[in-house]
Regions:
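Active-site helical microenvironments for divalent-metal-assisted chemistry
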Residues: 1-137
Length: 137
């Protein structure tokens, strides 16, 4: 979003995870959370650097083609590290969604309200601010 370098988002997510008290594995997971989805990184590489717990969380955070949202969220809810990172990821995405087009913003708000409201402190406030900005446009 916004043409920023790829690394900007994972670093921002890692900072949020750190602020929320995430341990080293959670912070590594934050940095790696989009690798399987957005790059050519291999699971073996992630495991070699982060270990099996980080790999498991990254797998849970990776949206596969044709994924079922309820199953995806169920997996995340069952893994404390994945849940922490997903909350931070969504929070950062909401913070940067102010820069996107209105149709995308509306869809993102609706999806957040349905699936993500309990994942992170501050999400409800950001959703309200986004909704208000949509109404003003």
């Amino acid at each position: 979003i916004g043409g920023e370098p790829y690394i900007t988002h994972p670093v921002a997510v890692e900072k949020i995870v750190k602020e929320w008290g995430g341990d080293t594995d959670a912070r590594i997971t934050a940095l790696f959370h989009d690798l399987l989805e957005d790059t050519d990184a291999k699971e073996e590489e992630i495991e070699a650097i982060g270990g099996p717990e980080v790999l498991q969380a990254v797998r849970l955070l990776t949206k596969k083609k044709g994924y079922d949202m309820a199953e995806y969220m169920s997996g995340i809810e069952g893994n404390a590290m994945a849940k922490l990172v997903k909350g931070a990821d969504r929070l950062h995405n909401l913070q940067t969604a102010f820069c996107t087009d209105e149709k995308f913003k509306r869809k993102y708000i609706d999806e957040t309200k349905k699936w993500y409201m309990d994942l992170a402190p501050g999400i409800a406030d950001l959703v309200k601010r986004l909704e208000d900005s949509c109404k003003q446009s």
